[in-house]
């Protein structure tokens, strides 16, 4: 029975992971590097203990750290020299201690959908309940409502069905280019990257009245599961939905996952465009940019 969730003992999996995330930019000639913003430090929590974290840049430059409005660690790099190659190297070691099969202690008032957030919850969730992409014809909302089973729908089952629906609707394709498709573009094209999966899920959930946020970070895939999961050797994106009692529940629509036993969050955001790992500029000729390479390695 749902209200007995708190009495169920969950099996926790403790694992130590090492992350290396290296981004290399190459230019055809030396350019003046502008300020760069980096979101590369994993978010510490009850389930994630950060042992060490280091970010280095070549050419060397001062790095200052701060926290943004969502509590994400934000590094700003002020380059003072010209260069034809820029290397940003982030390394971290951490312990992840999360239930492989989590049980959520959802408040009695929220077990059945639709439910109402408290006045304080609604105020604090604020913009996280507002869709960020236009849906002028109501196509996305109609798509999302198709997962509602009636006037009395189990809330967690609805969210699981919605996540599965994203995975069934979109074909997964890796995409190195920047940017994210709108939910309508994803529905029209029928394919997308993990970012597109997460955005479609979050926007659909917001349309149904949920508070939702995007999460970016890394995905750990054990060797025996690499053929069954998508998103290895790259940054990853997923979602969190706020449900009273349970708090923020993690959903990975790319892999039809619930819970964060193999997810390492770096940033949470209202809009996926607020959680770009590396953002910056340079001054030089328009054709000076040559290439970008990203290498991500998550090992136990």
Protein language model features and the residues they cover:
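Intrinsically disordered, low-complexity N-terminal segments that are enriched in acidic
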Residues: 10-115
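Structural beta-strand/beta-sheet cores of well-ordered domains, especially the beta-sheet scaffolds
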Residues: 15, 21, 34-36, 53, ...
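Glycine-rich, small/acidic residue-mixed loop/short-helix segments
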Residues: 38-48, 55-56, 255-289, 296-300
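Glycine-centered loop/turn motifs
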Residues: 91, 151-152, 228
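Secondary-structure boundary elements
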Residues: 109-192, 200, 208, 270-272, ...
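Hydrophobic/aromatic-rich core segments of domains that either
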Residues: 164, 196-284
């Amino acid at each position: 029975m749902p209200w007995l969730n708190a009495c169920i003992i969950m099996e926790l999996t403790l694992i130590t992971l090492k992350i290396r995330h290296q981004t290399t930019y190459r230019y055809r000639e030396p350019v003046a590097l502008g300020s760069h913003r980096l979101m590369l430090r994993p978010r510490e929590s009850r389930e994630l203990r950060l042992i060490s974290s280091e970010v280095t840049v070549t050419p060397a430059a001062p790095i200052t750290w701060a926290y943004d409005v969502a509590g994400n660690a934000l590094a700003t790099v002020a380059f003072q020299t010209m260069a034809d190659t820029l290397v940003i190297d982030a390394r971290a070691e951490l312990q992840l201690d999360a239930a492989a099969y989590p049980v959520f202690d959802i408040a009695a008032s929220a077990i059945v959908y639709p439910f109402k957030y408290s006045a304080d919850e609604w105020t604090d969730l604020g913009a996280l309940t507002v869709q960020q992409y236009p849906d002028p014809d109501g196509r996305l909302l109609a798509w999302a409502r198709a997962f509602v089973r009636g006037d009395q729908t189990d809330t967690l089952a609805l969210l699981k069905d919605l996540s599965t629906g994203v995975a069934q609707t979109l074909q997964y394709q890796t995409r190195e280019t920047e940017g994210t498709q709108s939910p309508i573009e994803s529905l029209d094209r029928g394919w997308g990257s993990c970012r597109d999966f997460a955005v479609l899920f979050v926007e659909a959930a917001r349309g149904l009245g949920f508070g939702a946020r995007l999460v970016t970070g890394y995905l750990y895939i054990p060797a025996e599961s690499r053929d069954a999961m998508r998103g290895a050797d790259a940054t990853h994106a997923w979602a969190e939905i706020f449900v009273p009692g349970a708090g923020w529940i993690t959903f990975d629509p790319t892999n039809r996952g619930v819970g964060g036993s193999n997810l390492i969050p770096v940033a949470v955001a209202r809009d996926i465009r607020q959680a770009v790992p590396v953002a910056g500029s340079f001054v030089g000729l328009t054709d000076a940019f040559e290439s970008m390479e990203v290498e991500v390695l998550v090992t136990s």
